[in-house]
């Protein structure tokens, strides 16, 4: 398992508080889970290559908290999740929608601390 932070959002954050949101064993490879945050929900993904990614769970097109239920894959060499409702693809590392580049999801820094999966939250 790659225990390094898997995205660059941490580089732009002023100060993060790392919050344990689940155990690694709670996320099967190739799937996602939804986690509740103080201000909403995050979609946490574990790829088949054991990389961790975290995005906002709120789908801006269907207006439902369903991104964590999307299918993981790749398009044009980019790792993506397909929304389960209208099938838009969001890049796991940037949150950008491939079908509408004016739309993006918040990306959360994520890391593995032992067997705890942690999100970096600015609070």
List PLM regions with ranges.
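A boundary/linker detector
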Residues: 1-20, 24, 123
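Short, hydrophobic/aromatic-rich segments at coil-to-beta transitions
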Residues: 19, 28-33
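N-proximal short alpha-helices
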Residues: 25-28, 83
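Rieske [2Fe-2S] iron-sulfur-binding domain
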Residues: 32-123
């Amino acid at each position: 398992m790659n225990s390094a932070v898997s995205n660059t959002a941490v580089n732009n954050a002023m100060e993060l508080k790392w919050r344990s949101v689940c155990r690694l064993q709670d996320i099967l490879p190739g799937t996602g889970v939804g986690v509740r945050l103080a201000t909403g929900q995050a979609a946490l993904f574990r790829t088949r290559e054991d990389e961790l990614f975290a995005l906002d769970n709120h789908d801006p097109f269907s207006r439902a908290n369903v991104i964590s239920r999307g299918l993981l894959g790749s398009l044009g060499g980019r790792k993506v999740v397909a929304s389960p409702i209208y099938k838009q693809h969001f890049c796991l590392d940037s949150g950008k929608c491939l079908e509408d580049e004016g739309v993006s999801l918040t990306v959360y820094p994520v890391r593995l601390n032992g067997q705890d999966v942690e999100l970096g939250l600015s609070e």
